[in-house]
Structures are given as C-alpha cells and as structure tokens.
C-alpha cells in the first residue's frame, strides 16, 4: 500500500462497479475483500462504488454481506473499523448462477443496470475472474455474447485474469486469442499478486532512481543472480489442482519470471505501462530457449517425501488427497537460465521454487564479483564475505547489502557485515494483502504492474522445453527430498557444478 502521508494526496478511483466471479471462493474471502476494505479505509475507493458477487451458491444479498463481514474480521490485515466496514458492505449485492449459463448474464446485466442507477457508477465496470483457470474462457465469451464488456458511451470495461494464464505455450496463445475476440488488449489485466508487494515494485525505483546501482548492474560486475520462492506449506487441499499443474507451471512463468524481468530489463524510456511492459517482454525474449537435452541438463525437479516442518509430521506428497499414488508431478523446480544480450551475456540466473521446504522465503539475491586482488595478505580472497544485494519479498520485505569491513582491533581482520533497509522501520503503513495497489491501478487504468500478452507468451516459450523434456522422462530423473528440508540434493549440485552455492533458506546466508 501507499505510505499514509502520500495516500491522502492520491485521488480516489473513478466510479465503477466491481464484479467478482467466484465470489464464494477462498480468494475473494482471504484477499479481495480485505484489500477493498483497506482501499476504503484509506479513502481510495470511490463514493460511487458497487461490488457484485457472482457464484453458483444460492444466497441472498444479506447472507452474502454477512459472509463477507465474517471473512473481513478473519482475514483483515488491520483492525476493522465497523463504520468503514458497514459503508463497504452496503455497496455489495449478489447474483447466483453458473459461469457458463446464459441466464446468469441476464441476471448480472439487470443487476448492473440497477446498481449503476442507484450508485451512480457511470457504467464503468471491472470484472474479476477469481475462478479456476478452466472458467476463464467460458466467462469471457459469455460476457462478450451478453455485451456486458463492450465499451460504450465513454464508460470503460476491464477484465482482471488471475494466474495461471494457460498451462503451456499453446494454451496461453489460445486463451489470448479468445480473450482478444471479446476485449482489446488494453482492457485485459493479467494479474500477478507478487507485483503488488512493495519490495517487488521497489526494484525499478532501486535501479533507476539511484545513480549508484545501474552503472554496476551488468556482466562486468555481477557474477550471478538467484531467485528463490520457497514455501513451507504443503500442497494441502489443492491436490487435484496441483497434480495437474506442478511447481514449474504454477510459479515460474508468472512469479519468478516477473522478478527476473524487473531485475534484468533495460531502463524504459518512460515510466508508463507501454514502455515498462515492452522492456519486460523484450528481456524475456532474450532468455535463451533451450533444447530438451539442455533443459534436462540445466534443471532439477523434485517431489517431497514424508518429513517434519515446525516439529509437525508431514506426509509424503503422493499420499495427499486427490493426488495419484504414483504421481511424477514436481513439487520443487530449479532452473539455470541465461540471457543473450549485451548486459547479461555469461551471467547465469538460478531459479528455484518448492513446497514443503524448511522455511518460507522469497528473495532475489544479486551476487557481485569478488575483488580482483588480495591486497590484505592475511585474508585470502576466498575467505572474504560474498557481496550480495538481497531484495527480500517475504516473510519480511527488506533490502540488504552484504559487504566486508574491518573487525575492530589492532590487526587488519576482515569480516562480513550487512546494511539492511526494512519498510517497517521507515514507513508507518498498515500491512496489506498485496492486492490493494493492483486493484486500484486497474480502476484508474494503469497497467504497469500487469502482464501483456507478449510477455505471457514469452514466459511460456522459455518454460516449454522443460515441460516437454520432463513429460518425456516421466518418473525418470525425478528427485526426492524430505519435507522440511532445503530441497533435493540434485538442486545443490546444479548450482555447485556451475561454481556457485545457494543461499540458505533459514537465515539467508
């Protein structure tokens, strides 16, 4: 969210109706409603606002409002002010029906007409698909047939699509084609909630608003980059979804590639959606697309076995409900990628993500090259602390720089130290869900933090050889790791064979 002092200077979003498909689901309760409450509390929701929930469950408006009130109290990131909550809940109504039933859209159209007159939302509509990916295409097509997404009389119509956007390159292209039959590209907002996190948004500010980093942000000074998205959570109740998806599809083309593109992109000519998204897409186009043999060489896929996390026993992945007992789906993926351009030639990017690991940690770690000469004879270069710039996303949002300094005393003894910036030390913002900025930006028509079709397809193009190679290998080559560990040993070997080492997950060293 915005700093409290600056939020007051930001205008509320324009009048609009916010339609959520899948309104009875987990995403709406845990993230969307708390995010809308936070926007309302900061005065960033318009007075002329309406929220319409759409789901299969039969429910009255009153029952839906009460359901969301309970969710708000359970999942709010700040203390709930009942006056603000009441003001928000009064704007909410509900339409029951299936996403592929034409009757649903007749009822939705009638409800939109009603709230637009009653609330004065001026015909502006924001549709949010908080549904399984299989529903994206039917909902978009039904909106098109009903004419609900057609822009007219100066009013805007926008659609937010959750990840995963496709399951491979072919399906991503097909989904883009289908959406573009109904809406223009500038109406489609492909959301990645990682881009709502302050540290992620701060990457561009760190690079381009400070004169000290960009001159050394290149192959002459950077040895390698590590991007880690580690989760201590297991698959849990998502067995059916996960066993048809896996860690690679679930995390890499979206979360990890968004981080990679922000780290590796060239400076945009302007800070606007077109320029920023063009540079992000261009750097993904420059990532070397591997052959299947190269993909096997430069990757590791793993699956967790039984173990312990936080002193609690964890059963193996294959015993999870709705998971096949002989499943070869990966719960861990590690890749080595390279970027074929002037800035990054020869600099490896190591990516890893996994479930049921020893610690929850998301970070980008940029390793700078060692000093070229051992001037301090009693401290060989190999004993000097490594110079890392670490951008921590979760569990704590921070930026730290690790470097060498003299240890106090009469001799020249050298030790590693770090300088750390934590958001909570400088800004008084209440915690957020990460969705507030994204929802607000969509309402005002700012697409900088959203993916464009070419960027999505570029990501799948990079991932496709890994998907194809792993599918062909089946169970062969699948590594195993204990739940509560740092991942498979083969992942350690992947980076070790390239002369580097992963940072630890527990304390980030």
Question: How would you label these PLM feature ranges?
Answer:
Residues 1-161, 165-509:
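Secretory/organelle targeting and membrane-embedding segments
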């Amino acid at each position: 969210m915005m700093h409290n002092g600056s939020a007051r200077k930001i205008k509320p979003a324009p009048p609009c109706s916010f339609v959520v498909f899948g309104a009875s689901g987990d995403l709406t309760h845990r993230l969307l409603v708390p995010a809308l409450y936070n926007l309302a509390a900061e005065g960033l929701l318009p007075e002329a606002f309406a929220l319409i929930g759409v789901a299969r469950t039969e429910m009255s408006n009153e029952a839906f409002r009460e359901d969301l009130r309970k969710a708000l109290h359970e999942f709010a990131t700040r203390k709930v002010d009942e006056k603000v909550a009441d003001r928000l809940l009064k704007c909410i109504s509900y339409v029951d029906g299936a996403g592929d039933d034409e009757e649903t859209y007749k009822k939705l159209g009638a409800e939109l007409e009603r709230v637009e007159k009653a609330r004065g939302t001026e015909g502006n509509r924001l549709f949010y698909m908080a549904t399984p990916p299989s529903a994206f295409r039917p909902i978009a097509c039904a909106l098109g047939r009903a004419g609900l997404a057609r822009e007219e009389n100066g009013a805007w119509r926008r659609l937010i699509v959750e990840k995963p956007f496709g399951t491979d390159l072919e399906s991503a292209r097909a989904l883009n084609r289908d959406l573009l039959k109904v809406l223009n590209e500038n109406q489609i907002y492909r959301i990645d909630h990682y881009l709502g996190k302050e540290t992620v948004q701060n990457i561009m500010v760190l690079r381009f608003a400070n004169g000290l980093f960009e001159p050394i942000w290149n192959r002459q000074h950077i040895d390698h980059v590590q991007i880690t998205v580690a989760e201590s959570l297991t698959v849990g109740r998502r067995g059916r979804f996960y066993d048809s998806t896996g860690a690679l599809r679930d995390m890499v083309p979206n979360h990890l590639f968004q981080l990679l593109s922000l780290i590796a992109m060239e400076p945009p000519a302007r800070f606007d959606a077109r320029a920023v998204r063009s540079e992000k897409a261009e750097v993904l186009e420059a990532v070397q697309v591997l052959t299947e043999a190269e993909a096997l060489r430069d990757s590791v896929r793993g699956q967790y076995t039984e173990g312990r996390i936080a002193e609690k026993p964890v059963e193996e992945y294959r015993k999870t409900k709705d998971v096949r007992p002989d499943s070869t789906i990966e719960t861990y993926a590690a890749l080595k990628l390279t970027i074929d351009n002037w800035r990054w030639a020869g600099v490896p990017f190591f990516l890893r993500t996994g479930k049921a690991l020893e610690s929850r940690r998301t970070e980008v770690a940029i390793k700078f090259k060692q000093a070229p000469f051992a001037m301090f004879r009693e401290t060989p270069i190999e004993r000097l602390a490594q110079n890392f710039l670490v951008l921590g996303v979760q569990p704590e949002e921070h930026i730290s720089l690790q470097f060498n300094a003299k240890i106090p005393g009469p001799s020249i003894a050298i030790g590693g130290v770090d300088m750390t910036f934590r958001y909570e030390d400088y800004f008084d913002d209440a915690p957020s869900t990460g969705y507030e900025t994204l929802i607000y930006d969509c309402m005002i028509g700012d697409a900088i933090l959203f993916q464009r079709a070419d960027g999505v397809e570029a990501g799948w193009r990079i991932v496709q050889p890994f998907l194809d190679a792993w599918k062909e290998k089946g169970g062969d080559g699948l590594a195993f790791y204990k739940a509560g560990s740092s991942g498979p040993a083969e992942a350690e070997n992947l980076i070790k064979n390239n002369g580097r080492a992963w940072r630890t997950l527990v304390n980030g060293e």
